[in-house]
């Protein structure tokens, strides 16, 4: 690389390598963002389930899977204690209000992580776009 008059000269190979690295980073960040969003939705669903159990009538329909392909009809679920995932495979049997607080904290952490990942993703996409524009201009100049 050479620098003169505030202009930097970079080889096309370096730009292509940088674009490839950014593309891989973008793919990884998108995957991570999707996983965090899925975890966030799961935490929200868990909170909704706790609220549903607390206010249940006689019968309750619970989804046996994530998509609701199988529903279970349940009667009279004891609502004094629930099991909540503490992470790393550990669960605690606690009162629903405590579980809701834990889920609120988890939701807050996931929202913060989602914002951080989204910001990193936007930066990577902007950098990739700039490199792509430079490569397009270089290709047009070579064609002339």
Curated annotation (Swiss-Prot):
Major site of localization recorded for this protein: cytoplasm
Cellular location(s): Cytoplasm
GO cellular component: cytoplasm; prefoldin complex
Molecular-function annotations in GO: unfolded protein binding
Pfam families, per database record: Prefoldin
Species of the source: Metallosphaera sedula (strain ATCC 51363 / DSM 5348 / JCM 9185 / NBRC 15509 / TH2)
Protein name, entry field: Prefoldin subunit alpha
Assembly and interaction partners: Heterohexamer of two alpha and four beta subunits.
Gene expressing this chain: pfdA
